[in-house]
Amino acid sequence: MEYSTFGKHIIVDLWGVDFSLLDDMYFLEHHLVHAADLSGAHVLNVSTKEFDPHGVTVLVLLSESHLSIHTYPEKNFAAIDCYTCGTTVEPQIAIDYIVSILKPNEMHIKKLIRGIGEIVNTD
């Protein structure tokens, strides 16, 4: 079987997110896995890490690549990264779901197309 190198990569910075949501590893793990499912991705594994005194990293390893979040609750900030290879998964669905759950006051997003030569910014 031949695979395409084409991929969609979305990176998002969220500001003004509630501290308690960003410091809850189980809440974030549940919602990132659900977001991946909604996007059509296939979850292979989930890795989580709580930091002292605050902060969480959740990495969802996908058959199609990955979805991750790194949080800084004391700054009400989260960094989200979703990269999917091929054309069968829509990472924007995962991002939209996570944003709807976290309800940031401010959001900055970059969308990239990868694997076609030069990285293309779609904004």
Swiss-Prot record:
GO MF, one example: adenosylmethionine decarboxylase activity
Coiled coil stretches, renumbered: none
Annotated gene: speH2
Pathway(s) the chain acts in: Amine and polyamine biosynthesis; S-adenosylmethioninamine biosynthesis; S-adenosylmethioninamine from S-adenosyl-L-methionine: step 1/1
GO BP terms, alphabetized: spermidine biosynthetic process
Cofactor(s) for this UniProt protein: pyruvate
GO cellular component: cytosol
Record keywords, A-Z: Autocatalytic cleavage, Decarboxylase, Lyase, Polyamine biosynthesis, Pyruvate, S-adenosyl-L-methionine, Schiff base, Spermidine biosynthesis, Zymogen
This enzyme's EC code(s): 4.1.1.50
Function: Catalyzes the decarboxylation of S-adenosylmethionine to S-adenosylmethioninamine (dcAdoMet), the propylamine donor required for the synthesis of the polyamines spermine and spermidine from the diamine putrescine.
Originating species: Bacillus cereus (strain ZK / E33L)
Cofactor binding note of this UniProt entry: Binds 1 pyruvoyl group covalently per subunit.
Active site: 65 (schiff-base intermediate with substrate), 70 (proton acceptor), 85 (proton donor)
Protein name per UniProt: S-adenosylmethionine decarboxylase proenzyme 2
Reaction(s) this enzyme catalyzes, per UniProt: S-adenosyl-L-methionine + H(+) = S-adenosyl 3-(methylsulfanyl)propylamine + CO2
InterPro entries in the cross-refs: AdoMetDC_C (IPR042286), AdoMetDC_fam_prok (IPR003826), AdoMetDC_N (IPR042284), S-AdoMet_deCO2ase_core (IPR016067), S-AdoMet_deCOase_pro-enz (IPR017716)
Family: Belongs to the prokaryotic AdoMetDC family. Type 1 subfamily.
Keyword set includes Secreted: no
Subunit: Heterotetramer of two alpha and two beta chains arranged as a dimer of alpha/beta heterodimers.
Top-rank taxon, per record: Bacteria
Residues under site feature: Cleavage (non-hydrolytic): 64-65
Residue list for modification Pyruvic acid (Ser): 65
